[in-house]
Design a protein with these regions (language model features):
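A short alpha-helical cap/connector motif
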Residues: 1-113
Length: 113
């Protein structure tokens, strides 16, 4: 990825501590070699959610649900997230992670293409 180092440093400076369940899911995903968003992407998403305050979000590619949970935690209460996953092995893991994070009502997972 080509990103100016100053921008990456700035985005990392915005990073605040995540909620414990996100840290746990991140560690599990990394241990299982499941791709999740990078730290600077997390920081950027948090800033964009604060600025835009969306009421609907569509995510293509759920994986284990890490980014959907992140967006759910940092978006307005009335925001609803729809995420789509077609890899059958990850769907139950994502659903379990949504439950762990208390996000079952805020996040809808659609299975398939």
């Amino acid at each position: 990825m080509i990103v100016e180092e100053r921008l990456t440093t700035y985005l990392h400076s915005l990073e605040s501590a995540d909620i414990p369940v996100l840290d746990e899911i991140e560690q599990e995903a990394l241990a299982d070699m499941v791709p999740i968003i990078r730290k600077e992407t997390k920081s950027f998403l948090k800033v964009m959610l604060e600025i835009k305050r969306p009421v609907k979000i569509l995510e293509i590619g759920t994986a284990v649900g890490f980014s959907a949970i992140l967006m759910g935690k940092y978006s307005p209460e009335e925001c609803h997230i729809t995420t789509i996953e077609n890899y059958e092995k990850r769907i139950p893991i994502a659903r379990a992670n949504f439950a762990r994070a208390g996000m079952e009502q805020k996040i809808t997972l659609l299975e398939g293409d």
